[in-house]
From Swiss-Prot:
Keyword Ribonucleoprotein in annotation: yes
Any one GO BP annotation for this protein: translation
Family under the similarity heading: Belongs to the universal ribosomal protein uS11 family.
Pfam families reported in the protein's UniProt record: Ribosomal_S11
Key words of the record: Ribonucleoprotein, Ribosomal protein, RNA-binding, rRNA-binding
Gene that encodes the chain: rpsK
GO CC terms of this entry: ribonucleoprotein complex; ribosome
Protein name: Small ribosomal subunit protein uS11
PANTHER family, per the entry: 40S RIBOSOMAL PROTEIN S14/30S RIBOSOMAL PROTEIN S11 (PTHR11759)
Originating species: Mesorhizobium japonicum (strain LMG 29417 / CECT 9101 / MAFF 303099)
Length: 129
């Protein structure tokens, strides 16, 4: 019996002019998600999704490439203005922000939403940078 051909789900074009860019930058990777005001995901990308492997994922260049990719996807939906929420201690924070600005977005606000413990759990091994 023949298999049914896999359906290709086509992304419908949403006309959303403003949204929120969530930049999550860890020591190992940088993930960028663009959502609408309610938090529904419009587009996402990461350094690993761009083909970087291992320690190359944590570089600022990899974060820049991920930001350019997610910017292109979001602009297909009519996105023009962004609020940026940056989270995490990684090295891709600034370069992802610059790449989003260079892609033609109007950045209305930048917030650092990195969770800071008030002396909670003991952190993992001491980082040697």
């Amino acid at each position: 019996m023949a298999k049914e051909a896999a359906r290709v789900r086509r992304r419908e074009r949403k006309n959303i002019s403003s949204g929120v860019a969530h930049v999550n930058s860890t020591f190992n990777n940088t993930m960028i998600t663009i959502t609408d005001a309610q938090g529904n995901s419009i587009a996402w990308s990461s350094a690993g999704a761009q083909g970087f492997k291992g320690s190359r994922k944590s570089t600022p260049f990899a974060a820049q490439m991920a930001a350019e990719d997610v910017a292109k996807k979001a602009q297909e939906h009519g996105m023009r203005m962004l609020e940026v929420e940056v989270c995490g201690p990684g090295s891709g924070r600034e370069s992802a922000l610059r790449a989003l600005q260079a892609a033609g977005f109007t950045i209305t606000s930048i917030r650092d939403v990195t969770p800071i413990p008030h002396n909670g759990c003991r952190p993992r091994k001491k980082r040697r940078v």
